[in-house]
Amino acid sequence: MYYPFVRKALFQLDPERAHEVTFQQLRRVTGTPLEMLVRQKVPARPVTCMGLTFKNPLGLAAGLDKNGECIDALGAMGFGSIEIGTVTPRPQPGNDKPRIFRLVDAEGLINRMGFNNHGVDNLVENVKKAHFDGVLGINIGKNKDTPVEHGKDDYLICMEKVYPYAGYIAINISSPNTPGLRTLQYGEALDDLLSGIKNKQLELQQKHQKYVPVAIKIAPDLLPEELIQVADSLVRHNIDGVIATNTTLDRSLVQGMKHCDETGGLSGRPLQLKSTEIIRMLSAELNGRLPIIGVGGIDSVIAAREKIAAGASLVQIYSGFIFKGPPLIKEIVTHI
């Protein structure tokens, strides 16, 4: 496969520049006959989750296609689902560059992107043009300049706009790169947010005559007692699923490596065991009451199987896709 050569060229570039170059090419082929250049045939492995049928259990995690610009090209590679975003009500530039760093030896990434995106209206226009036949998840967040105590309003604005076009909606309250965002995972703040989201979901179900499931994306840095409280809140508010996990602030597995002390969330292989353990604890606590989408350091069939064995119904990749490329999709879907 050609990807090792592509990767070698891309890894000569700054990580964000490499992403821009890749997306320039993908934008050229998405929705055109040139999609055949990136198309991969993968076997059907249907899975039902959150009331939806996924053609296979492997999805692309949020963060790669923040604005939904390359949905069809990415879909052609064989993903059963694609999660676009995180998107916010208004466009925002994100944090200052440089803001993403490769830990090549560890096959990890540290990012402090800060929800850079073109805004929810732009994303919706892109989604309208897409023809992806898998499940499209839309991951939503709050603007950086929205006070945390008013954060719920941003989620409800985004829900209203993406609801007609989403297969499911992911609520990102676990990015470490938006000040105060992770506080929404705790206690009354979480209950208030989930209550508002559930009410809005039922209101939009009536309006559009279709039910779009909602999943909450959580951090891997929650303590066991905090995880129990989160699980309890998700069940009480009849949330449809949980995505475990986002990036970690923990650097214990990358000490001494170049860029290890950069501020931001760590993803990739160093997150693998930590996220799997969160899934295992969450699964024991939920006891089948709502499904788990497993993400964090999946870079092989074995790593994907470990997430499923720990209790995940579906899995997603991001950093593994950067390091291994499209062949990883085919490998996981074929052998999982």
Swiss-Prot record:
Record's bilayer topology term: Peripheral membrane protein
Binding locations of FMN: 62-66, 86, 139, 172, 217, 245, 268, 297, 318-319
GO MF term set: dihydroorotate dehydrogenase (quinone) activity
Pathway participation: Pyrimidine metabolism; UMP biosynthesis via de novo pathway; orotate from (S)-dihydroorotate (quinone route): step 1/1
Catalytic activity: (S)-dihydroorotate + a quinone = orotate + a quinol
Role: Catalyzes the conversion of dihydroorotate to orotate with quinone as electron acceptor.
Family assignment from sequence similarity: Belongs to the dihydroorotate dehydrogenase family. Type 2 subfamily.
Protein name: Dihydroorotate dehydrogenase (quinone)
Gene: pyrD
